[in-house]
């Protein structure tokens, strides 16, 4: 059995990112993880978010490094175990760096977040839990729907491109990922002002939104406890990542899941098991189509029956008239014969 386990490679998936320090410490963490497996075969696969979601629906890896929004959904619906959260260097609490800071141009007259509803807002194309989804969480917590508040969203490939669009007046505001404002060059920062900046005890950076765990390591329920402990021991005691942060005890993902549920996030739709209500809702159009066809057939049937009755009545009426004419003819013929006979008798008597 252990030989079979050794021959079967341990699958490690990681979410690929293009911005921020996670593009360095997540692949390095995956290297450390497979290094702890000894002579066990392994396979590391890297996917961007759409690919990862698609693959996870059909293939459950042993370990996965991902943003905590996907982590919360995997924990909830695929029963993955949340092993560790990544505590960023600028964070003072386990994994609590996933927030967003909304910035506006220095000369903008926008006073608060509510005024941004429906305006043109920039976001990073790559940002998930940090940045975009925390901003969505903030708007939905205030009673807005995602569709109404973020009606005119524009995606940018990097912060610089987005900030330049903001300064040029192409967009009204920009959603920055947690701590990205502090990393901007001073020249750029001087042309901006944070909207509703808040200071949280968990981080040394400003934020507009609540903070959530950022990166998570999760293990499949089929991974043996012994292997989980080996991986935990390796990553928690590793100092090689200290430039970026460290892996710590898992921060709860309940609030992340609640945010996704509240804002009707598409991840919920991707992984939530279907209920009878969902199936009925999905079937509403085909069912309506079938009912309309049946109703059409019923109406057609009624019209055909009505037409048949009408035609039958016309035929009956025609026959009745024909019989009446025939009867008249018979009477006339009878009268004619009697008249002729009478004439003949009278003629004979003469």
PLM region descriptions:
Residues 27-37, 107, 191-264:
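Extended ligand-binding regions for polar small-molecule ligands
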Residues 51-115, 136:
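Acidic, polar ligand-binding/catalytic clefts
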Residues 229, 233, 237-312:
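N-terminal membrane insertion elements
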Residues 299-302, 306-309, 313-316, 320-323, ...:
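Residues at a fixed heptad register within alpha-helical coiled-coils and interdomain linker helices
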Residues 321-350:
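Conserved HAMP-HisKA connector
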């Amino acid at each position: 059995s252990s030989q079979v386990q050794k021959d079967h490679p341990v699958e490690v998936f990681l979410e690929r990112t293009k911005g921020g320090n996670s593009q360095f410490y997540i692949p390095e963490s995956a290297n450390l993880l497979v290094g702890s497996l000894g002579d066990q075969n392994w396979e590391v696969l890297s996917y961007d978010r759409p690919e990862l979601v698609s693959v996870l629906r059909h293939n459950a890896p042993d370990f996965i490094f991902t943003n905590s929004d996907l982590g919360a959904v995997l924990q909830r619906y695929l029963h993955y175990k949340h092993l560790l959260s990544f505590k960023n260097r600028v964070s003072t609490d386990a994994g609590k760096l996933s927030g967003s800071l909304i910035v506006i141009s220095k000369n903008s007259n926008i006073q608060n977040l509510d005024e941004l509803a429906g305006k043109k807002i920039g976001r990073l194309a790559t940002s998930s839990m940090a940045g975009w989804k925390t901003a969505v969480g903030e708007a939905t917590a205030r009673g807005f729907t995602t569709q109404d508040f973020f009606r005119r969203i524009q995606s940018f490939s990097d912060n610089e491109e987005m900030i330049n669009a903001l300064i040029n007046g192409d967009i009204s505001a920009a959603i920055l990922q947690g701590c990205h404002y502090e990393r901007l060059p001073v020249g750029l920062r001087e042309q901006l002002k944070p909207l509703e900046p808040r200071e949280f005890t968990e981080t040394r950076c400003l934020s507009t939104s609540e903070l959530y765990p950022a990166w998570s390591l999760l293990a499949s329920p089929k991974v043996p406890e012994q292997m989980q402990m080996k991986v935990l021991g390796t990553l928690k005691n590793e100092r090689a990542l200290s430039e970026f942060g460290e892996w710590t005890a898992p921060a709860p993902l309940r609030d992340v899941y609640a945010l996704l549920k509240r804002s009707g996030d598409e991840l919920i739709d991707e992984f939530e098991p279907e209920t009878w209500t969902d199936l009925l809702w999905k079937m509403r159009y085909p069912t309506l189509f079938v009912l309309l066809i049946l109703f059409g057939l019923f109406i057609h049937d009624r019209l055909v029956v009505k037409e048949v009755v009408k035609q039958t009545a016309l035929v009956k009426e025609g026959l009745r008239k024909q019989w009446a004419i025939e009867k008249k003819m018979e009477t006339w013929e009878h009268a004619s014969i009697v008249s002729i006979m009478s004439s003949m008798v009278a003629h004979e008597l003469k």
